[in-house]
Structures are given as C-alpha cells and as structure tokens.
C-alpha cells in the first residue's frame, strides 16, 4: 500500500545547505528548496547537475547563464534547467526563489559542490 503520509515543513526551521539554500519538503522523487534574500554577486563557476530543476522567482532579479545563453529572471518568472546542462546564476539584486529538483538534490550530497 502506498505511503499517504503528509508532511508539513516550516521554512523557519529548515536545514540550510552549504550554498545557502533552505531545504523544504522532499518526497521520493522530488524536493523543494528556497533561496532567500540571496545578495548580488558575480557568478560562481558553471556546473552541471545530476537532476532537473524548475524554479520560480518571488523577489529580485538574477541572470541564469546556461549553455551559452543569458536569461534574465524577474518576479513572476519560472525556468527549467535540464539535467546535465552547464549553468550558473548571477544575482543582480536581493533575490528570493523557490526551486524543485527531480530527483531530490540534497540526496547523497548532489547539491553541495
């Protein structure tokens, strides 16, 4: 019989990853994370991840640098980073966004480098 347990997560008590993300709800095949009030910065080294990411901007602006494209992300925008796509972000102003990853990013340290 499938597990039908519902879990509620309060972001005020969520664990924080090494990159600054807060880990939110997580299931067997998908997880959520919150980037809260990220400050302007230069892009980090581009990376490719073993998971797909979808995101939604709540506040602020950032550039997604992905596979030779620069995409401006503003409040109300959503985006997809395909599994294996080389990418990085440049935060232009204090930035808050929610992302979902599949498979879950924080399993086995996938999210920490």
Specify the residue positions occupied by each region the protein language model found:
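Ligand-binding loop in jelly-roll beta-barrel domains
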Residues: 83-107
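Histidine-centered metal-chelating micro-motifs
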Residues: 42-44, 79, 83-88
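A short glycine-rich, His/Asp/Glu-containing loop-to-beta-strand
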Residues: 10-45
